[in-house]
Amino acid sequence: MFCSALRNILRNSQNAAKNATITSQIRNLRGQQSVHHEVEVLTSPGITTKQNDKKTEPAECEGSKEVALDFRNREAHVPSFNLAAYVNNSSTLQQFLSLGVDLHSIERRKGLGDFVLKLDFEKNVKPYITFLVDQGVSPDDFGRMFTKNPLLFKEDLDDLQTRVNYLKSKRFSDEARQRILTQNPYWLMFSTRRVDRRLGYFQKEFKLSGHDLRLLATREPNAITYNMEHLRKSVFTLKEEMGFNAKELSDLVVRKPRLLMIPPDDLVERFSYIHQDMGLPHAQIVQCPELLASREFRLRERHEFLKLLGRAQYDPQKDLYISPKTIVEGNNFYFVRNVAKSDLETFDLFLKTR
């Protein structure tokens, strides 16, 4: 059988690869030894080196007067106390645990542990639960929402209702509003004016209709409140470095808005492999935006395996066509059985000999 013969070839190449690796390691070891001796001769025992471990991060801002809210990237720190030690004596913490809140995750973010500990469940938490239930949010989502954004309890309830009413005025359906609130608990921290500016930016930048704008915001609510500097860099990368035209860019971000949140360097790396190595044109990439959302090494592994089997055929006008989006669907077992039409043993041997 073809797969059996292929496995024999892969095993032989694997042994050859091992020998080559051993030889390379010996050479590297010899090189390291010689370098080590040189360093010992040149380094004086009285000389010490210092490293500056301080790291600065660029400030994130939306405009000259508005600082972007970045709740997710709060600096992790060693908590001064453990919330678990207060659970037995705090009915609020007990209620949070029953809702599925991850107290350990909260206490690792500076200042939030102390804030949560001071909350009174009946006065400071229960009204917000009632508000969320009225918006159609499922109680099953409370734990994840409060873990991500406990600062929600600082917001005025009237302001929260105003922000929900804004979404209603923009014709977001009940299901869309529920998804936005559960998938992005930080959305309610943004004023209606600020959300309006964000939605306006997306509509103008990508020339979206009202329907497409609502579709984008519902599919990936986090994109609307994401750091503006990052969004602008991603748009520049998609336009100028990858060469998508205005229509292609619009279709791309509506179908997969999460692409705007991926680091631009990663996008370029993936696009380069998809466009040059796999040979897919821009129009086909727009139809399969999942490719750009997948890690480059995963694309490479699966494409090269299909190429080895003679099945890397992505032209729909030819026989044995394979839809590019199926390459990144499912786990390895699904890919090998349903796309490559092979077996895991052959695929594992292929990965070991790469």
Swiss-Prot record:
Protein name: Transcription termination factor 3, mitochondrial
Cytoplasm listed as a keyword: no
Pfam families linked to this entry: mTERF
Any Gene Ontology CC annotation: mitochondrial matrix
Function: Binds promoter DNA and regulates initiation of transcription. Regulator of mitochondrial ribosome biogenesis and translation that is essential for development. Required for normal mitochondrial transcription and translation. Required for assembly of mitochondrial respiratory complexes and normal mitochondrial function. Maintains 16S rRNA levels and functions in mitochondrial ribosome assembly by regulating the biogenesis of the 39S ribosomal subunit.
Residue ranges that the Swiss-Prot or TrEMBL entry lists as coiled coil: none
Keyword check for DNA-binding: yes
Superkingdom to which the source organism belongs: Eukaryota
Compartments, as annotated in UniProt: Mitochondrion
Example GO biological process: mitochondrial large ribosomal subunit assembly
Keywords: DNA-binding, Mitochondrion, Ribosome biogenesis, Transcription, Transcription regulation, Transit peptide
Upper classification of the organism: Eukaryota, Metazoa, Ecdysozoa, Arthropoda, Hexapoda
Family as reported in the entry's similarity comment: Belongs to the mTERF family.
FT transit peptide: 1-89
Mutant lacking the gene: phenotype: RNAi-mediated knockdown is pupal lethal. Larvae display a delay in development and a decrease in body size. Display progressive defects in mitochondrial respiratory chain capacity as well as a decrease in the enzyme activity of all mitochondrial oxidative phosphorylation complexes. Decrease in enzyme activity is particularly severe in complex I and IV which also display a decrease in the levels of their assembled complexes. Progressive reduction in 16S rRNA levels and impaired assembly of the large (39S) mitochondrial ribosomal subunit.
Molecular function in Gene Ontology: double-stranded DNA binding; large ribosomal subunit rRNA binding
